């Protein structure tokens, strides 16, 4: 194996977020409020299964232990199960997860697990069906809930649920969410609303700090857990009376980036060192055949020298990210 990916600030990178499409069939207010608009990339322009196999092989050789498949909505790809299987070929990759809107969970989750999927994150921003539809533009609440149940039935011991925290939308519904996870092994992750190029007005109206929830959880006796090296950025809390857990993702905290352990590759094969940042490093010309792996690994390693110490969000810098479907959130 080549040397472990490490940047100039001695941060080690064990986690790859790999976008496989930017297409989504939901119209979430904080991501694609006007629905998906093609950016000139056709479905044939997204990374192929073979390209995904090569890029994940290179990252595995460089110490990656976890790959998360993102979008857009990853399950809209007809070859999604094949993609999972291709990533699974790498023995060094111990965890393969997906972030999904849950649209196809009920139908396909058992097949995904058989192909090698080990983790699921489902986006659910409200437990009220009408509010869910208002946020997502889709009347699919019951379908998504059935999908979460199907994930447990398929053998997943835990399901993570992502909830974007929004003032006057769901920030006051903590008790409802806590009741939901009391007897279910769900890690409910509240994610602070992030400002993007297309979402400034929404951010000003609905942003609220996760610190408010953290203070309330601590007041109620929830206990902060230690992170593992391939975990995402969530601060996770547990409580002896609950089967579920609470996670808080607060990107506006000053030291949020100090423990960064993840890199991103977009659906068209660009390496992004940060969700909010530069235009990306093209990898696609080195994904054409298996003989290029050494050069591919060298380019990835060299790019890491340019990774900045922080995303500067706390200094009101939103980078180039127009919306969160662009490189997989």
From Swiss-Prot:
It comes from Escherichia fergusonii (strain ATCC 35469 / DSM 13698 / CCUG 18766 / IAM 14443 / JCM 21226 / LMG 7866 / NBRC 102419 / NCTC 12128 / CDC 0568-73). Binds 2 [4Fe-4S] clusters. Binds 1 [4Fe-4S] cluster coordinated with 3 cysteines and an exchangeable S-adenosyl-L-methionine and 1 [4Fe-4S] cluster coordinated with 3 cysteines and the GTP-derived substrate. This is GTP 3',8-cyclase. GTP binds at residues 17, 68, 99, 160, 262-264. Its EC number is 4.1.99.22. Belongs to the radical SAM superfamily. MoaA family. SMART domains: Elp3. PANTHER family: GTP 3',8-CYCLASE, MOLYBDOPTERIN COFACTOR SYNTHESIS PROTEIN A. Gene3D superfamilies: Aldolase class I (3.20.20.70). The keyword Signal does not apply. Its cofactor is [4Fe-4S] cluster. Pathway: Cofactor biosynthesis; molybdopterin biosynthesis. Monomer and homodimer. Catalyzes the cyclization of GTP to (8S)-3',8-cyclo-7,8-dihydroguanosine 5'-triphosphate. [4Fe-4S] cluster 2 binds at residues 257, 260, 274. The lineage of its organism: Bacteria, Pseudomonadati, Pseudomonadota, Gammaproteobacteria, Enterobacterales. [4Fe-4S] cluster 1 binds at residues 24, 28, 31. Residues 8-234 form the Radical SAM core domain. InterPro entries: Aldolase_TIM, Elp3/MiaA/NifB-like_rSAM, MoaA, MoaA_NifB_PqqE_Fe-S-bd_CS, MoaA_twitch, MoCo_biosynth_MoaA/MoaC, rSAM. Keywords: 4Fe-4S, GTP-binding, Iron, Iron-sulfur, Lyase, Metal-binding, Molybdenum cofactor biosynthesis, Nucleotide-binding, S-adenosyl-L-methionine. Disulfide bonds: none annotated. It catalyses: GTP + AH2 + S-adenosyl-L-methionine = (8S)-3',8-cyclo-7,8-dihydroguanosine 5'-triphosphate + 5'-deoxyadenosine + L-methionine + A + H(+). Signal peptide: none annotated. One of its GO terms (biological process) is Mo-molybdopterin cofactor biosynthetic process. S-adenosyl-L-methionine binds at residues 30, 72, 123, 194.
């Amino acid at each position: 194996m080549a040397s472990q990916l490490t940047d100039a600030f001695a941060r080690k990178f064990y986690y790859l977020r790999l976008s496989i499409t930017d297409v989504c069939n939901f119209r979430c207010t904080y991501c694609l409020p006007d629905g998906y608009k093609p950016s000139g990339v056709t479905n044939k322009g997204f990374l192929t299964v073979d390209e995904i196999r090569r890029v994940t092989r290179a990252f595995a050789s460089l110490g990656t232990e976890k790959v998360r498949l993102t979008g857009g909505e990853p399950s809209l790809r007809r070859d999604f199960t094949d993609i999972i299987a291709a990533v699974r070929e790498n023995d060094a990759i111990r965890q393969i997860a997906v972030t999904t809107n849950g649209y196809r969970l009920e139908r396909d989750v058992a097949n995904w697990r058989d192909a090698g999927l080990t983790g699921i994150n489902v986006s659910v921003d409200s437990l009220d069906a009408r509010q869910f539809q208002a946020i997502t533009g889709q009347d699919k609440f019951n379908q998504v809930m059935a999908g979460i149940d199907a994930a447990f039935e398929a053998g997943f011991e835990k399901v993570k649920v992502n909830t974007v925290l929004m003032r006057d939308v769901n920030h006051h519904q903590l008790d409802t969410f806590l009741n939901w996870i009391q007897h279910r092994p769900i890690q409910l992750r509240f994610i602070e609303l992030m400002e993007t190029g297309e979402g400034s007005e929404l951010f000003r109206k609905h942003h609220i700090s996760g610190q408010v929830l953290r203070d309330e959880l601590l007041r109620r006796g929830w206990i902060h857990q230690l992170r593992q090296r391939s975990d995402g950025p969530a601060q996770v809390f547990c409580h002896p009376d609950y089967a579920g857990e609470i996670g808080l993702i607060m990107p506006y905290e000053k030291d949020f980036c100090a423990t960064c352990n993840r890199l991103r590759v977009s659906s068209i094969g660009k390496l992004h060192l940060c969700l909010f940042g530069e235009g990306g490093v093209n990898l696609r010309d080195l994904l054409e055949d298996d003989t290029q792996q050494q050069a591919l690994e060298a380019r990835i390693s060299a790019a890491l020298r340019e990774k900045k110490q922080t995303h500067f969000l706390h200094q009101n810098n939103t980078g180039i990210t127009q919306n969160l479907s662009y490189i997989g959130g």
